[in-house]
Regions:
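Short, small/polar-rich loop/turn modules that mediate ligand/substrate recognition or access, typified
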Residues: 120-124, 175-177
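Canonical Rossmann dinucleotide-binding motif of NAD(H)/NADP(H)-dependent dehydrogenases/reductases
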Residues: 1-35
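A glycine-rich helix->loop->beta "capping" turn
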Residues: 5, 31-60, 124
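A conserved structural motif in NAD(P)-dependent oxidoreductases
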Residues: 149-160
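A glycine/serine/threonine-rich, flexible loop-to-helix segment
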Residues: 127-149, 189-194
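Conserved SDR Rossmann-fold cofactor-binding beta-strand/turn motif
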Residues: 124-134, 168, 183
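Short C-terminal tail/terminal secondary-structure segment
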Residues: 165, 176-194
Length: 194
């Protein structure tokens, strides 16, 4: 997917994983510029990376919310911005085998939606809910999810990255407070068996 970021600055908050690394690479290819330190406080786009697999220690959802809110205030002051949360699809469909992980992601999703309400129209705040994604190994989700995924396969890193690019695209000016599930249809109800 190609978009024109026209030199927009991008800040990253959270853990590294193959999906976020590929998203950052794609944003740079599309004329985005990664900034760190003091420059990150005035970034045009904030990408917040949450753990995508159960068992990975997550940052406190309240801490992530506070970071995102602080950036939203700064973005509002300089006129506009985008915040994209990269989180697990369990934010919308909890897994019985992973209650804490599901609750943490649902909490982050609720925080994302409150930020969208508070800071619109200047700041667009959205999330990409990643289901089972594999490279050589499971990058996101749980292998058990695959038996309940209507498309019958794991997703690719590139498919998750395309959703991030959609939310960052300057032509996308009307979407906020949404989570786009990149999960092969898992959230359509199949998760209840977990």
């Amino acid at each position: 997917m190609e978009i024109d970021l026209a030199g927009a600055t991008i800040a990253l908050e959270g853990a590294s994983n193959p999906v976020v690394e590929a998203a950052l690479a794609a944003l740079r290819v599309n004329d985005g510029r990664l900034v760190e330190g003091i420059q990150a406080q005035r970034a045009d786009i904030l990408l917040i990376s949450c753990p995508l697999r159960p068992g990975v220690t997550a940052e406190n959802p309240s801490t992530l919310y506070a970071v995102a809110r602080k950036m939203a205030v700064a973005m509002t002051e300089h006129g506009s911005g985008r915040i994209v949360f990269l989180l697990s699809a369990t934010a919308c469909m909890p897994m019985r085998r992973h209650p804490r992980f599901s609750m943490e992601n649902a909490s982050i999703l609720a925080g994302m939606r409150t930020l969208a309400m508070e800071f619109g129209p200047k700041v667009l705040v959205n999330a990409v809910g990643v289901g089972a994604v594999e490279d050589e190994t499971m990058v996101s989700g749980d292998k058990a999810m695959l038996s309940h995924t209507p498309v019958g396969r794991a997703g690719s890193i590139e498919e998750a990255v395309a959703a991030v690019l959609f939310f960052c695209d300057p032509l996308n000016t009307y979407t906020t407070g949404q989570m786009l599930g990149v999960d092969g249809g898992w959230m359509a109800g199949y998760g209840r068996n977990f």
